[in-house]
């Protein structure tokens, strides 16, 4: 084969290889186009998923503490339908209290990232119950926890997390800047009320579904404050009560009616010689009942009941089983203030059943320790100190603190009545213990008409922490 033939042969082979390569590239392009067309066609014509529920789980490890960020069930083909919580039912008949939640946040906080907080409370929508709490802008076992015994500071915020979970930066939702707060759900959205600012000019900021909708300026310029527990929603309207004025004398008290976070009406109570602070409120047959703290002069608790037009009645729980702390020993009650040993107080609650009343109170008459529930069948209207049932919640030797009411609506439970529930704050740290911080965990109970247990469910944290030594 001469030189020209070799050149022609090599050229032919190269040409054939090039043509084959070109054909392969064209084939790849055609296959890619066909694949894209098939995928696009499938997206345009989605198939119906045979499963009714799809579950997504996101899990994160933080400082060797396992935190389940979310566990959300999504019903295929279904959306969350807003409703209006009616609030027209009566309270469910109950014979005792079943434990509902315990977050153990102080115990967990010795190792994990847990908020320093106080004033926890619980509120439920028609879909879930959440724990709300006032943080100090600090974590347990950290240097910024120093001095958090202080009630009011610019670092305090209202946050919330799923009920029963220890409140951490990884499972909590910011709600408002606040050192006094309330929150509730009307079936369509969350209303939050956060009070912050100077003692002589604080402002309450109202948010509906996270958006600022209204404000309330302090009208007496003496520490505007609100419930530290849930507000009440009935038929699309929500209600709260606020205090402005002295903590040890006659103050001013206002009822507020709100719709979608906007104030539509307010009135000032005509309540001489009464003192209302930190009211625990609940709905009952279309009305609102609030049981409050008298920090001025009473061992028993004041109440205010009002309808949706804010027409109200006021009084004190008549029972000789006194509910405040500090308080006198049980004895002769009064339908007005029981003045013996009545100065100072603690947030608390009661549930009215006709002439009877469930009274929640500390076991100690002088310190915030222990907790018990007492059923006085005539205690709302009669002044004797007899009662028919007592259920132990926290032992006398263990710390308690604030307590308050919340309810579960029929739209959540499927029952035909409103279930009464309560929470108890378990305060740890200063001023009673040798720490640099003050914080708390919480437990909650709900009323049932079946078997219950008397026991003690204390905070249980072993103090002091490393930061305190």
UniProtKB/Swiss-Prot annotation:
Annotated region (Involved in apical transport and lipid raft association), positions in chain: 11-33
Entries under InterPro entries matching the protein: Glyco_hydro_34 (IPR001860), Sialidase_Influenza_A/B (IPR033654), Sialidase_sf (IPR036278)
Active-site residue numbers: 151, 402
Pfam families, sorted: Neur (PF00064)
Gene3D superfamilies, per database record: 2.120.10.10
Required co-factors: Ca(2+)
Keyword set, alphabetical order: Calcium, Disulfide bond, Glycoprotein, Glycosidase, Host cell membrane, Host membrane, Hydrolase, Membrane, Metal-binding, Signal-anchor, Transmembrane, Transmembrane helix, Virion
Residue sites binding Ca(2+) per the record: 294, 324, 344
Topology with respect to the bilayer: Single-pass type II membrane protein
Disulphide bridges: 92-417, 124-129, 184-231, 233-238, 279-292, 281-290, 318-335, 421-446
Keyword Cell wall biogenesis/degradation recorded: no
Virion surface side: 34-469
Domain topic, free-text comment: Intact N-terminus is essential for virion morphogenesis. Possesses two apical sorting signals, one in the ectodomain, which is likely to be a glycan, and the other in the transmembrane domain. The transmembrane domain also plays a role in lipid raft association.
UniProt function note: Catalyzes the removal of terminal sialic acid residues from viral and cellular glycoconjugates. Cleaves off the terminal sialic acids on the glycosylated HA during virus budding to facilitate virus release. Additionally helps virus spread through the circulation by further removing sialic acids from the cell surface. These cleavages prevent self-aggregation and ensure the efficient spread of the progeny virus from cell to cell. Otherwise, infection would be limited to one round of replication.
Other noteworthy facts: The influenza A genome consist of 8 RNA segments. Genetic variation of hemagglutinin and/or neuraminidase genes results in the emergence of new influenza strains. The mechanism of variation can be the result of point mutations or the result of genetic reassortment between segments of two different strains.
Quaternary organization: Homotetramer.
Record family assignment: Belongs to the glycosyl hydrolase 34 family.
Protein name, per record: Neuraminidase
